[in-house]
A protein has these predicted regions:
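N-terminal Rossmann-like FAD-binding beta1-loop-alpha1 element of flavoenzymes
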Residues: 4-31
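Conserved Rossmann-like nucleotide-cofactor binding loop
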Residues: 14, 37, 203
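Glycine-rich FAD pyrophosphate-binding loop
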Residues: 23-45
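Mid-domain catalytic core of redox enzymes
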Residues: 25, 186-285
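Short loop/edge segments at beta-strand edges and connector loops
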Residues: 33, 78, 181-186, 298
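A conserved beta-strand/loop capping segment in the N-terminal third of enzymes
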Residues: 42-50, 57-106, 146-147
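Active-site/ligand-binding neighborhood in enzyme catalytic cores
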Residues: 83-195, 199-207
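Conserved flavin/dinucleotide-binding core of flavoenzymes
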Residues: 94, 249-328
Length: 328
């Protein structure tokens, strides 16, 4: 059996992860990217400025931790954002500290969380801006709530940022003799390849007729910080009278030197947050494509609300399927 050839469309985190995993197993990988390496995780190597909002890597999966540590050193970072509300600043994640801040009261650390207060001041306006429709109170059941004092926004064993940025980490993933990268826009045509991995938006594939909607975000850079002095690098803007949903002091987050603040305003151009009407039908369509040698991967490729660790796990699953198919 000769060396298998793989075509990967997209050099974001999903594409780079798949490329490296398969290259290490002896596959010949051609990866195509129409813009720059990094996708929505792209940052500036010199200043560490993150172009598409704050990215903080976190996971509890030992396999994922071992994988990323092959390509980057990480510095620890614990994400404890601040909510900017009509009642003033409140600490996140949601805990009794949040309620103390909102009510301006001294409360026992074991006091029950006031869900009504959380919904009215943290969730309602933020969610309406983010998703373009009123929030349902049932969303409280899906939120991580600390009964006592709050910890990290992410309840994972590993949390931090690569010291040289995510872009550098992904470039290191592609540094393998079995990987060739071409900066060119292409489609899913697999002529000349044994398998194709698609990490672009799934609704750009030929024949994809399942309904996928996207919420886009406009990213606005500023030198002046309206929230100065800050209590944390990341502020969630939970009030209706400001358009933005989030404001990040990038240097405070990354340790860089861009001197820039990044604001996120919902409903801009781009495909950032997927909304799938029928997940089961979409997954069935993806499974049918796999039988034809076309594998969808990543946040855009599967229209899934993945964090970075989820994306790498998804890449591992896709590569495992391909390797098993080769053995069949």
């Amino acid at each position: 059996m000769g060396q298998k050839k793989i075509k990967i469309v997209g050099a974001g985190l999903a594409g780079c992860s798949c490329a490296r995993l398969l290259a290490e197993q002896g596959f010949k990988v051609d990866i195509f990217e129409k813009y720059e390496i990094g996708g929505l995780c792209r940052d500036d190597y010199a200043t560490k400025f993150q172009y598409y909002g704050p990215h903080i890597f976190h996971t509890s999966n030992p396999e994922v931790i071992c994988f990323v540590l092959k390509f980057a050193d990480f510095r620890a970072f614990t994400n404890r954002p601040i909510a900017w509300t009509d009642r003033g600043l409140a600490r996140l994640p949601i805990s009794i500290e949040t309620i103390k801040d909102l009510k301006k009261q001294t409360l026992d650390d074991e006091t029950e969380i006031d869900n009504e207060c959380v919904f009215d001041n943290i969730i309602k306006d933020y969610s309406k801006k983010q998703w373009g429709k009123p929030a349902e109170k049932s969303v409280l059941g899906r939120l991580k709530v600390y009964k006592g004092l709050g910890g990290s926004y992410f309840n994972d064993t590993f949390e931090g940022l690569p010291t040289n940025g995510f872009g550098n980490m992904m470039e290191n993933m592609l540094n393998h003799p079995n990987i060739n990268i071409t900066f060119l826009e292409t489609d899913e045509n697999g002529s000349g390849y044994d398998y194709v991995i698609w990490t672009g938006a799934i609704d750009e594939l030929v024949g994809m007729n399942e309904k996928v909607e996207w919420r886009g975000t406009k990213f606005v850079e500023h030198k002046d910080d309206m929230f100065k002095p800050r209590l944390a690098p990341v502020y969630n803007i939970c009030t209706e009278y400001l358009q933005m949903t989030r404001s990040t002091d990038m240097d405070a987050l990354t340790g860089g030197n861009s001197g820039l603040i990044l604001e996120e305003i919902p409903n801009g151009d781009g495909k950032h947050y997927p909304i799938v009407k029928n997940r089961q039908k979409l997954d069935e369509w993806i499974a049918e494509k796999e039988k034809q040698g076309l594998y969808c991967c990543g946040r855009l490729g599967t229209a899934s609300y993945f964090d970075m660790d989820d994306t790498i796990e998804n890449a591992m699953e896709v590569c495992e399927k391909i390797m098993k198919d080769c053995e069949a």
